[in-house]
Amino acid sequence: MQYLNFPRMPNIMMFLEVAILCLWVVADASASSAKFGSTTPASAQQSDVELEPINGTLNYRLYAKKGRDDKPWFDGLDSRHIQCVRRARCYPTSNATNTCFGSKLPYELSSLDLTDFHTEKELNDKLNDYYALKHVPKCWAAIQPFLCAVFKPKCEKINGEDMVYLPSYEMCRITMEPCRILYNTTFFPKFLRCNETLFPTKCTNGARGMKFNGTGQCLSPLVPTDTSASYYPGIEGCGVRCKDPLYTDDEHRQIHKLIGWAGSICLLSNLFVVSTFFIDWKNANKYPAVIVFYINLCFLIACVGWLLQFTSGSREDIVCRKDGTLRHSEPTAGENLSCIVIFVLVYYFLTAGMVWFVFLTYAWHWRAMGHVQDRIDKKGSYFHLVAWSLPLVLTITTMAFSEVDGNSIVGICFVGYINHSMRAGLLLGPLCGVILIGGYFITRGMVMLFGLKHFANDIKSTSASNKIHLIIMRMGVCALLTLVFILVAIACHVTEFRHADEWAQSFRQFIICKISSVFEEKSSCRIENRPSVGVLQLHLLCLFSSGIVMSTWCWTPSSIETWKRYIRKKCGKEVVEEVKMPKHKVIAQTWAKRKDFEDKGRLSITLYNTHTDPVGLNFDVNDLNSSETNDISSTWAAYLPQCVKRRMALTGAATGNSSSHGPRKNSLDSEISVSVRHVSVESRRNSVDSQVSVKIAEMKTKVASRSRGKHGGSSSNRRTQRRRDYIAAATGKSSRRRESSTSVESQVIALKKTTYPNASHKVGVFAHHSSKKQHNYTSSMKRRTANAGLDPSILNEFLQKNGDFIFPFLQNQDMSSSSEEDNSRASQKIQDLNVVVKQQEISEDDHDGIKIEELPNSKQVALENFLKNIKKSNESNSNRHSRNSARSQSKKSQKRHLKNPAADLDFRKDCVKYRSNDSLSCSSEELDVALDVGSLLNSSFSGISMGKPHSRNSKTSCDVGIQANPFELVPSYGEDELQQAMRLLNAASRQRTEAANEDFGGTELQGLLGHSHRHQREPTFMSESDKLKMLLLPSK
């Protein structure tokens, strides 16, 4: 009991209190560790926790325990239990700041060492600024856990040191893609940039398990969308609204008003043209005028596509998608076809209009060159094929590449609003083609018309000259305006291409500024670089003005007359107006129906032309210089079927530089037609009087050749043959056929018309004498217009001076007359005429007629020989000779030359160079006969040279020409040249006669008739009075 010392009781109580306090501290530490979710056990301060340094950085990798056996996780494929830490200073969070973006943090200690802030208040203010990322929806959902792991990380003591848990590098990379629009801006500080030094790889973080509100909002001018194709670049979940943000609301109203007015005017203008063509389609359906109709039709349909946006709710339906974003990359699934329909209406028909414009320039160029209408009409099917198929190919290509984009400010869908390279290839490419091809044809056509205008003195009609001037002005103005509009449109497109990137970048900066300053009271964000509304207005004006310019082709008096006739017809007051057709068009119509004439024996043609087309482009350059009237006489109409039977038939051919007198290729075989100046005598009976009309025509020498080979021959062979024919015509050499004797004689007569135009020169047939006699026959001309009414005195003097020369040329000529009533045909021939006219004094008032008697003298003998040579040459004018016959011919000619060497020496000198292919051809420039036509002013003459009737190989056509003044024909020749020409003619006749006798062939007609018929063609002698009657009898 002694050891019990009660006074020591207070010491025991003190010891118990200390023990209880220690137990409470340990229990509290355990509870705190469980509260923060730490995997570190209560003995974390112990030295048994393993920390692995990461690549020599300040970061450590912490491996958690696997389970009861306390084995760590070293499996590299599972990083859920691997955490990364770094030494830091921890601070306890309060209840007010223990949240992050509205979610409560699962720990109470945090650290500021991962940021650049020094106080918790600064950190919270900056964290609130990141609420602006809600306007980048995809970014907002991905970046909230990362921001909480950086701004408010978990912090605790490990092995006795404060350690902060780090977010992983993968966690940082997740936020880069949806937040890329702001990632490289000042909105994201450097400590938020993904870096493996700051954020180790393959680490877990507790913040990833936190729940956040990830709902984002799209900031105007963006709208939310779930279609990835509609996302604005850099802002996933939002797309640009349908209304173009680069233009203000006021600018939208201006553009819509301009499209409405300009489109309506263009629509009405094109509708007027289309209606004008429809009401008079029969007269207007001719090229190139009908091309204007198709151009205006294309612009009309395109204007309809432009104006459809003004119907109720159509604009939004055309250019906007269902989610409110702008349409692009159409066609797409799930959307209506309104955008595609508008695209086809606008793009397809505008492109077709451009192609038709090129064809307009092409056809107009050919018309200005003077080519016939049929040559252009035959290409009509090709025009349609190209004009409608080429735009179709471009349209299908555009839709196949999904390059149809909408544009809200213009209210249509078009090609390449986003992909400018596609717009350059599918729009600007065809425009450049229009400029190049159309400009080429317009330039050539204008040069031709300017050439006609320059030589306007050759055009006798003032209206024709004014018509050329009007055509030049119309086409020139149209071409100039079209060129300007296309160039301005191309310039507008190029301006858009150049500045599109600047506008896009400026809009992007505007979006970033609005997102960054969303919580500012007064925002200073605006689009720095925007497209000019003036350029867009100019572009639209050029487009619609082009359609209006194309409609001006119908702003002519012809269109007004067309509407007048239409209105009178609808009101029951139609007036039949007949428009007479020019003679050359009647001949062309007759030739086109020659098959009907051959099969049925009768022909029905139209002598009245249609009215002028509304455009006025169906002009004929060949008509501009024509001085003939539209009056068609019965004689001319009766002779018209004969024109069909003859190749190269031209009646009423005009003089001048017209190109319509080119040869008509009417035969399958090669044709060579040489048209020279003709003088022929036509005897007509008008009432009781007998008249002799002399007509002078000047026609260009043309060679029309067609290959004899098969139709399948190459084009190079045809070009070579045409080149040879042209060279032969230019040099006067003919390698395949020779001219008939009648053709040579016609050339002789024609060239001597112009030898002595003055009265003082007396050569050959016609002589110009005293002024009284000139006045006398001039007065007689007044009896009948365009005919030389010669009284007996003039005719007597004519025969006295020239009878010994003109009658031989009438030898062997078929003077025929035909009648449509009884289909009768009579033919008489005047052969071997040896007439000498007795010269006598005739007073001015002497009208007793002509006194003729036969006086044999020395001249008659020479004339008989001359006539025999001509007769023999006419009988063998179309005979072909073989090489052997040519040799025998040359032998016989050598024998005859020995008898008369002096007469034939000049012939060999002048004609040997024209011998080619065993045929002889003497050019018209070297065959001259002493003629003088000075006394027959304003006279008319027609003759027919019948070599080989109905032959398909060679025909010579001497046709009626318009009147010309012989005094204006300047060329003259000397006496030596005339004598030389006569020698050439005589020698040619002798050689042909010898060749005919050698071959026993005669003419082709004689060969067909046979021996008995040949005897019937022997010359018969007639009395002088009968011969003169045959000369003066009327003949058609």
From Swiss-Prot:
Residues 280-287, 361-381, 443-469, 554-1036 are cytoplasmic. Disruption phenotype: RNAi-mediated knockdown severely reduces adult survival following the ingestion of E.carotovora. Abolishes Cad99C-dependent formation of endosomes and DUOX-dependent up-regulation of reactive oxygen species (ROS) in the intestines of adults fed bacteria-derived uracil. It is a multi-pass membrane protein. The chain crosses the membrane at residues 259-279, 288-308, 340-360, 382-402, 422-442, 470-490, 533-553. Glycans are attached at N55, N95, N184, N195, N213, N336, N419. GO terms for biological process: adenylate cyclase-inhibiting G protein-coupled receptor signaling pathway; anterior/posterior lineage restriction, imaginal disc; blastoderm segmentation; Bolwig's organ morphogenesis; central nervous system development; commissural neuron axon guidance; compound eye morphogenesis; eye-antennal disc morphogenesis. Residues 1-31 form the signal peptide. PROSITE patterns: FZ, G_PROTEIN_RECEP_F2_4. Expressed in olfactory sensory neurons (at protein level). The modification Phosphoserine is found at S658, S659, S667, S670, S673, S687, S690, S693. Disulfide bonds join C90-C155, C100-C148, C139-C179, C172-C194, C218-C238, C242-C320, C339-C413, C513-C525. It is found in: Cell membrane; Cell projection, Cilium. Residues 880-899 have a biased composition (Basic residues). Residues 678-745, 870-902 are annotated as: Disordered. Residues 85-206 form the FZ domain. GO terms for molecular function: G protein-coupled receptor activity; identical protein binding; patched binding; phosphatidic acid binding; phosphatidylinositol-4-phosphate binding; protein homodimerization activity; protein kinase binding. Keywords: Cell membrane, Cell projection, Developmental protein, Disulfide bond, G-protein coupled receptor, Glycoprotein, Membrane, Phosphoprotein, Receptor, Signal, Transducer, Transmembrane, Transmembrane helix. Residues 32-258, 309-339, 403-421, 491-532 are extracellular. GO terms for cellular component: cilium; dendrite; neuronal cell body; plasma membrane. It comes from the Eukaryota. Segment polarity protein required for correct patterning of every segment. G protein-coupled receptor which associates with the patched protein (ptc) to transduce the hedgehog (hh) signal through the activation of an inhibitory G-protein. In the absence of hh, ptc represses the constitutive signaling activity of smo through fused (fu). PANTHER family: FRIZZLED, PROTEIN SMOOTHENED. Belongs to the G-protein coupled receptor Fz/Smo family. Interacts with cos. This is Protein smoothened. It comes from Drosophila melanogaster (Fruit fly). The lineage of its organism: Eukaryota, Metazoa, Ecdysozoa, Arthropoda, Hexapoda. The gene is smo.
